[in-house]
Amino acid sequence: TGNRQTDCAQCPKATEGILVHRKFPKGQHFPPDKCTQNCILFILQGELLVNSEEYPGTTLREGQFILQSIGSKLELLALTDVNYVVYWFNDPPLICEQRYHEILQQSEAPLTYTPLVMTQRITNFMKDICDYLDEQMPCGAFIDLKCQELMYLIICYYPRPQLSKFFYPISSYTESFQYFVMQNYEKVKNVEEFAHLG
């Protein structure tokens, strides 16, 4: 594969922290921490123990992925050497908004949350995006396009009942006051300004 012929590090469009490729050795532990954004975690290799309200004591294996909503507490422990991608977002970039809104309207809390399994399309996407992320600082505009593609691959290639359970944490959270606070706290300087937003 050819390498990028431009140096994106100096470009104002360069960005980090939206799609993140991570590798950790067995035993690496991340104590419980509140998610400041929604995230989808894709396991590429190894096993990762996840502990959260939605996925208590759940072992994620290669090819599986889960969603954690903004405000949820997430703890991670690498049971083996692990390789995974995290996608951080507030509002998902949508190509097919109608289907996404239909999914959210029909979403219901599952008795137990089950990780989704990557389709071949998502597996191929992950291989390509990891090669790209490992090269150098990513281009923000390109990452935005890839995130649209990724959400399209999730929203349009899985059955709606599966997706309505998968996205339930977002649908329930976006209706809450805490979500309103998290989405707006950077926009205001004091409580009085905050009151005017409501």
Task: Give the positions of each predicted feature.
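Short, locally clustered residues in the helix-turn-helix/winged-helix DNA-binding domain
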Residues: L44, I155, M182-E186
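N-terminal regulatory/effector-sensing and dimerization cores
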Residues: K13-S107
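A short, N-terminal "cap"/entry segment at the start of jelly-roll beta-barrel domains
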Residues: T1-A14, Y132-P138
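Hydrophobic recognition helices of helix-based DNA-binding modules
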Residues: V50, I154-Y158, V181
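A short, Lys/Arg-enriched amphipathic alpha-helix from helix-turn-helix/homeodomain DNA-binding modules
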Residues: M118-D131, C147, S164-K189, E193-G198
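Short, Lys/Arg-enriched N-terminal segment that forms or immediately precedes the first helix
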Residues: Q28, Y158-F166
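Amphipathic alpha-helical segments enriched in hydrophobic/aromatic residues interleaved with Lys/Arg
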Residues: Y100-L153, P161, Y179
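Hydrophobic alpha-helices of bacterial signal-transduction systems
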Residues: Q5-C8, L49, Y55-G57, T114
